[in-house]
Each structure stands twice: as structure tokens, then as C-alpha cells.
UniProtKB/Swiss-Prot annotation:
Family according to the record: Belongs to the DNA mismatch repair MutL/HexB family.
Keywords: DNA damage, DNA repair
Record SMART domains: DNA_mis_repair (SM01340), MutL_C (SM00853)
Name of the protein described by the UniProt record: DNA mismatch repair protein MutL
Signal peptide positions on this chain: none
Recorded superkingdom: Bacteria
GO cellular component, one term: mismatch repair complex
Length: 645
């Protein structure tokens, strides 16, 4: 007698449930997705014991006929697709016909449903077996209750986490679905307590506020981009609004929440050098494309997808985010009384806005007397005693005298003084225009130069030899001088590292680097990559290398330290990428060459530093993502001194 036999349906469903029903959140996801596919406009989810005891989902969707109710709990029975051609043009959230039978096989299910055109149907199942079937009320929609999850698979129960953890997973699922479908009203309750409520208005900003809070949602800016194959819309948080994990990035593809690491990497690339290490933004992206370009039939849970043109989509997302930040002044403002502001925000009707300080227009797009970034950083890297380029210092007084005359004449006429009412009016301004990223690279560069993102700042002093104090008509600014020159140096060195140059400095005494045998071999395999960054390693014995020259723009006195850092990156990186290697080298050199704390600067040096900073691509954060400038509005300062209440 043969040893191979066919499994009965209940056992097969239990096996399938191992992939589909991982935890209570999986049940919530499948049931709510069914409600959305049924054209529901309102969905209520009720949980007890984080869903382990009870999960109830009520919707006002299409409902089901009696014969469809029975068929819905059969394996691979679905109304979503008809043939194999439909499999490549999936617009619904469900299509496999596995969820309901898998859920029913490991729980007790009660289903009440009706199409609204006649009496409804009630089914009761236990462990996948039909227990009762009867007529029910004719309310249009579906009411399904899943109880005693995993009652017949005790081994699965052992892997469940605490109620708090499981509830967090379930709430996260509902949050993502609410973001993906803002036109559907969602209400999530746990033991009668409302955890989430959305109004189904279709405005995703209201959903963001319901999930992350009103203050966070107000600090998110809209983006929009389109290519031949993709349309991307969404909201991204300002660089100062971050979290400790990537869990706050929500990616929606054709209405389906997905997890995709390459897309998350593309988002992070858009925030390049704007985020501190280990911090991640809050992002909501809704991506629309032809279903042919995405394969959702990768895993039964339908969270993983594959794209046909993934590289093109990644580039579009990165460019869109970068363009959004190029058009904005990203200076964080300090609130005088955060508790009071928060309380007012919760009481008042709110709007979403990011206050943008528009700098005074320059006739030619560039302030008079400002020096070229590369020339300034080049002079700084030559090791002169002055921390700032001499050329910039020479030009600075002309700028400063003219600027100071302008500012103080305005102060005398009362133009500069910000009135509280005007400040409040700016706070209430709504920024509705999304950012589009459809311009070629040179056009984007021209636009960046035309819009002066960092307003002119007029120094008034220095705090502890570390922070520059400056002012303009918008209030007081504190500038971290080390971070500011780090940004200037970083952009200079990044450009130099990408150039092919024969300008090298020969060393009278070669530098020697010795490593263990295993590390020596790994370094030797990457000599070409290091050479493309200006580091030419020459084998010297069985475990050592010599460096006889280096590019002339290497920071003087820091050559060995920088080369060691670059070699260390080669040793620690899983794969050596020339772009990452140059990036790391630029960051290291910019930090080593920057002004340090407790270093007092002359007025002309401060002017030169600020004017050079204004010419950089991203003057708001250092290469490590730390802020360079913090803003105190005149209104907030007046609140500190109780001049306004």
C-alpha cells in the first residue's frame, strides 16, 4: 500500500493557517480587508484580550447571499478573480480564497450577513466545521465574530506575546488600513475603549492626526510626483520629527499596505544627511501603478510585493523627497511654552501647515560679496590659521556693513518688530501645494539657486565660543559653528572625492599601515576602490601597506587618521561600494577640519561662515543629521518675557 495520501480539508486548513493566521492581528487584517473589498464605507473593530478572546468586525458593505456564505469558508473560493489573467491585474486586497477557511479552522466563528434585499444569513463554525445555520436580520453588511483563537492548536498559543504587544500589532494593522483608505470610516475598540476613530472624509491628513497626533501631523508636508509608470502621493515629516524605528513608514501600493525594504531605503536616501544616526522619519506614501508592474502573489499574508521597475520607482521617490526639502527652509523653531502651545492646539480647530520663512529676494539670486563654496572650503583645507577662507573674510565686511545698516534702519522705523497677531496668522497658514519632482536635474539645480532657502542672518555675538547668535526680521537664530563648517567642508570634499585628479602631495616619509593577515587580504582586494578615493596603497611586506602620496586637498595633519578611517570602513562594510566609501571619507574629513567648540571667532569670520553656509545645498543639518540652526521667533521671545500672554 502506498505511503502518500491526501490530507483532509480541516488539516489542510490548519496547515495553511500557519502562514495566514500568525497572530490576532493577522485575523484583523484579513477581516477588515474583506470589508473594504465589499465596498464598505464604515468598519468597526472590537477586540477583547487583544483579539485572543474575541475579534468582531462590523461593516456596511455589500454583504453575501446564503449560498455564498457557505462557499466562502471553502478553500480557494473567492469572488475576486475568475481566471489566470485576473491574477496579474489584481485591484482587490484579497484574492487567494484562503483567509476565511484558515481562520475558521483555528477558532470559533459566527457570521451574520445580508445584501439588504432580503433576510440575512447566520453561520456558526467551530474548528472549521459548520455547527449552525439559520436566517437572520436583513441589515445590509457583514458582522463576523472570531472567538477563542487557536483553541485547537495549543502549540501556537505558546508563541503569543503579552496582551499589550498583541494589541499593538492589531492596532498597527488598523492604522495602516486607515491610511490606505481614508474614505472609509474606521473605529477600533478594545474592551469598549476607543483606540482609533477616523471620519472617512477622504482626507489622509485627518487619519495622520488620529494616529500620530495633531502636532505631528501638522509638521508633515505633502509631496506628489508622477512618471510614465508611477504616481506617488503622500506626506513626509520634517527632519526634526523622527522616530527610533522604520515602523512609522507606511507604504501603500494600489491601496494595499506593503513592506518593502528597498522603498524604505529610497525614502531614507531622500533624507540624506538630514536625519541623525539611528533615527527615521514618519512617512506615508500612496503609490499607484498598473497592476501588471507589481506581483502581490508572493506570500499568503500579501505583505510582500515585487516590482517590475523597482529602480525607477526608488529614484522617483528619492528625487521627490529631496525636491520637497530643497524648496523649504528647514530651521526648527523653539517654543517658549510647549505645554501651553499643545493645549491650545488640542482645543482649537486645526490646520496643517509648515511655516516657511521666506527670505528677502535678491535681485540676482545671490547676496553681494558671497564667496564660492568650493573656493572657500579649498582655502580652509589648506591649513591656514584662520578657520574661515581668507577670500570670504575679505568680502565679508562690505556685506556686513550694508546689511547692518539695512537691518537697524528697519528696526528704527518699526518694520522689524513682529506683532503677535501677525505671528499667529503665519502659524495658521495652510500649505496645500504638494511638491512635484518632474524636473530634470539641471532645472532642479537652477530652481535651487533661484530660491534662497536660508535667509540672510546678521551676527550679534557668540555664546561660549561655540554657538553664533544672529538675527533677522523673523527673530533670533542660534548656529552651531562646528556643524555649520562641517556642512561646508562636507559638500566640498564630496565634490573633490568624485573628481579624477592628478594633483597629489608627495610625502617625504611614507605612511605605513600594518594589519593582521586576514584584514590585509580584505584590504588588498579593495585597493582599486580606495585608489578611486585618492588613497593609493602599496604592498609593503606580508602584512603592511605604504602610502607615498595623497590628494592635495586632504586636511593637513589629518592624513593618516583619515586614511585609517577609510580602511576601517572597508573592513567593517559587508560590501564595498565606491559611493558609500566616498561618502564616509567626506564625512570624516569634514568633521576633522571643522571649527571646534570653545573657539572664538572674529566678526568677519562669522560673516564669512554664514554667507558660505547659505550657498550649500542643505544648510540646515550637518552630515550626521544634527541641526545647524535653531530659530526663536520674536513672538516666542516676547512670551518668555510675558510681553504677550
Amino acid at each position: 500500500m502506498g505511503r502518500i495520501h491526501k490530507l483532509d480539508d480541516q488539516l489542510a486548513n490548519k496547515i495553511a493557517a500557519g502562514e495566514v493566521v500568525e497572530r490576532p492581528a493577522s485575523v484583523v487584517k484579513e477581516l477588515v480587508e474583506n470589508a473594504i473589498d465589499a465596498h464598505s464605507t464604515a468598519v468597526e473593530i472590537e477586540l477583547e484580550e487583544a483579539g485572543m478572546t474575541k475579534i468582531r468586525v462590523i461593516d456596511n458593505g455589500d454583504g453575501m447571499e446564503e449560498e455564498d456564505c457557505l462557499l466562502a469558508f471553502e478553500r480557494h473560493a473567492t469572488s475576486k478573480i475568475q481566471d489566470e489573467h485576473d491574477l496579474f491585474r489584481i485591484r482587490t486586497l484579497g484574492f487567494r480564497g484562503e483567509a476565511l477557511p484558515s481562520i475558521a479552522s483555528v477558532s470559533e466563528v459566527e457570521l451574520v450577513t445580508s445584501t439588504g434585499s432580503g433576510p440575512g444569513t447566520k453561520l456558526v463554525l467551530k474548528g472549521g466545521a459548520l455547527v449552525a445555520r439559520e436566517r437572520a436580520a436583513g441589515r445590509k453588511g457583514t458582522d463576523i465574530t472570531v472567538s477563542n483563537l487557536f483553541f485547537n492548536t495549543p502549540a501556537r498559543l505558546k508563541y503569543m506575546k503579552t496582551i499589550h504587544t498583541e494589541l499593538g500589532h492589531a492596532a498597527d494593522v488598523v492604522n495602516r488600513l486607515a491610511l490606505a483608505h481614508p474614505d472609509v470610516s474606521f473605529r477600533l475598540r478594545h474592551h469598549g475603549k476607543t483606540l482609533l476613530a477616523t471620519n472617512g472624509s477622504g482626507d489622509v491628513r485627518h487619519v495622520l492626526a488620529a494616529i500620530y497626533g495633531m502636532e505631528t501631523a501638522k509638521q508633515m508636508i505633502p509631496i506628489e510626483a508622477e512618471s510614465l509608470d508611477f504616481t506617488v502621493r503622500g506626506y513626509i515629516s520634517l527632519p526634526e520629527v523622527t522616530r527610533a524605528s522604520r515602523n512609522y513608514m507606511s507604504l501603500i501600493v494600489n491601496g494595499r499596505y506593503v513592506r518593502n525594504i528597498p522603498l524604505m531605503k529610497a525614502i531614507e536616501a531622500g533624507y540624506h544627511t538630514l536625519l541623525p544616526i539611528g533615527r527615521y522619519p514618519i512617512v506615508f506614501l500612496a503609490i499607484e501603478m498598473d497592476p501588471v508592474l507589481v506581483d502581490v502573489n508572493v506570500h499568503p499574508a500579501k505583505l510582500e510585493v515585487r516590482f517590475s521597475k523597482e529602480a525607477e520607482l526608488n529614484e522617483l521617490i528619492t528625487a521627490t523627497i529631496r525636491q520637497a526639502f530643497r524648496q523649504r527652509t528647514l530651521i526648527p523653531s523653539v517654543s517658549a511654552d510647549s505645554k501651553t502651545v499643545k493645549a491650545k492646539a488640542e482645543q482649537a480647530s486645526w490646520t496643517f501647515a509648515h511655516r516657511v520663512h521666506e527670505p528677502p529676494a535678491q535681485p540676482d539670486g545671490k547676496a553681494e560679496g558671497t564667496s564660492d563654496v568650493t573656493a572657500a572650503a579649498s582655502l580652509a583645507s589648506e591649513g591656514s590659521l584662520s578657520p574661515l577662507p581668507a577670500a570670504a573674510q575679505a568680502d565679508a565686511p562690505a556685506v556686513s556693513e550694508e546689511a547692518e545698516a539695512s537691518v537697524f534702519s528697519e528696526r528704527r522705523t518699526g518694520v522689524v518688530n513682529d506683532l503677535p497677531a501677525a505671528e499667529l496668522k503665519r502659524d495658521a497658514e495652510v500649505e496645500e501645494e504638494p511638491t512635484e519632482a518632474c524636473l530634470p536635474a539641471d532645472e532642479q539645480a537652477e530652481e535651487k539657486r533661484a530660491v534662497d532657502r536660508l535667509p540672510p542672518l546678521y551676527p550679534i555675538g557668540q555664546l561660549h565660543g561655540t554657538y553664533i547668535l544672529a538675527e533677522n526680521e523673523h527673530g533670533l537664530y542660534m548656529i552651531d559653528q562646528h556643524a555649520a563648517q562641517e556642512r561646508i567642508n562636507y559638500e566640498y570634499f564630496r565634490e573633490k572625492l568624485g573628481e579624477v585628479t592628478n594633483e597629489v602631495q608627495e610625502l617625504l616619509v611614507p605612511l605605513t599601515f600594518e594589519y593582521p593577515a586576514d584584514e590585509y587580504e580584505r584590504i588588498a582586494a579593495c585597493r582599486d576602490e580606495l585608489a578611486r578615493c585618492g588613497v593609493f596603497l602599496e604592498p609593503f611586506g606580508p602584512r603592511a601597506f605604504l602610502v607615498r602620496s595623497h590628494p592635495v586637498w586632504f586636511p593637513k595633519g589629518k592624513e593618516k587618521e583619515i586614511i585609517e578611517e577609510m580602511i576601517e570602513h572597508v573592513l567593517t562594510a559587508k560590501t564595498v561600494d565606491i559611493k558609500q566609501l566616498r561618502e564616509q571619507a567626506a564625512i570624516v574629513m569634514s568633521c576633522k577640519r571643522a571649527i571646534k567648540a570653545n573657539q572664538h571667532l572674529r566678526t568677519d569670520e562669522i560673516f564669512a561662515l554664514l554667507e558660505t553656509l547659505r550657498q550649500t545645498t542643505d544648510p540646515f543639518t550637518c552630515p550626521h543629521g544634527r541641526p545647524i540652526i535653531v530659530h526663536f521667533s520674536t513672538y516666542e521671545i516676547e512670551k518668555l518675557f510675558k510681553r504677550v500672554m
